[in-house]
């Protein structure tokens, strides 16, 4: 009965607690984990602990109810307060270096249909691995039109091996006993570029800035999921500075990381804190050029036409949903 009562109220307490002012400078937030559905108290307690871990892993300021295999989320609408924790970054960077030094081969992948944040952060990890003299490959499937201009700058170049980028269809053939799989910009197994790598390799590392979900990757030897970071590129840029002082980025490498931050922050207009600008400043010092990045991110005329065609044929449903009936062939590879 008590659970039904607070469910009907949609956990308004999570929002009400923010109005409490008793001399505190920062806004108070509340995280709640509730476990139910089991036959005994001890089991429900364990389920509640898992629900609390999930609530905190998603950034806090919310309630999570775990009822068997079903999970319900409430709250989590407040502006995320940035955690400027250099110590945490150093610890994660040191752990990453130790793991890489103990292994010989690195496979890096982001989410399926990768955007520029996924590409840039994967590139940053690749640079770290190569600095530590490790064999490294970035796993790719379909490449979007926004990523292609950046990717082309590394293909058929003397400075980079031909197998820097490998197809997800061939990724399994690169697995060795000492292979480390590093996942960036995603923490859900089924959304990765090649999920089977997670099952085939014992050593998995996850770096992501999205809130954890119920199907997050489990069993990772190192997991750094920071929902307060603006982007995966910001996180990786920070780690580059701590893994090795001798890492020097080429200008077009810095461009890719800068582009990832720029896109995920809408041109530094949202989720941009001190860490974001410090990472951007580091990349600018290594040659990232704002004008060059903006030109590379522009849509070409065919993309503009495809988007305009889709919008012109769209309809509003119940004043809230926009849908279009444009031919799929016109939109393949176009980032909307």
Q: Where does each model-flagged region fall?
A:
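Catalytic-core segments of nucleotide cyclases and related cyclic-nucleotide turnover enzymes
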Residues: 3-14, 37-60
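Short catalytic/binding micro-motifs of nucleotide second-messenger systems
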Residues: 13-24
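A short glycine-enriched loop-to-beta-strand structural element that forms part of the catalytic core
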Residues: 23-49, 62-67
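C-di-GMP signaling machinery
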Residues: 42, 67-103
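A structured phosphate/pyrophosphate-recognition subdomain
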Residues: 90, 101-114, 121-134, 211-325
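Anionic-ligand anchoring segments at beta-strand to alpha-helix junctions in alpha/beta enzyme folds, i.e.
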Residues: 107-171
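Active-site cofactor/cluster-binding pocket
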Residues: 162-219
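Single conserved hydrophobic/aromatic residue that forms the stacking wall/gate
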Residues: 323-335
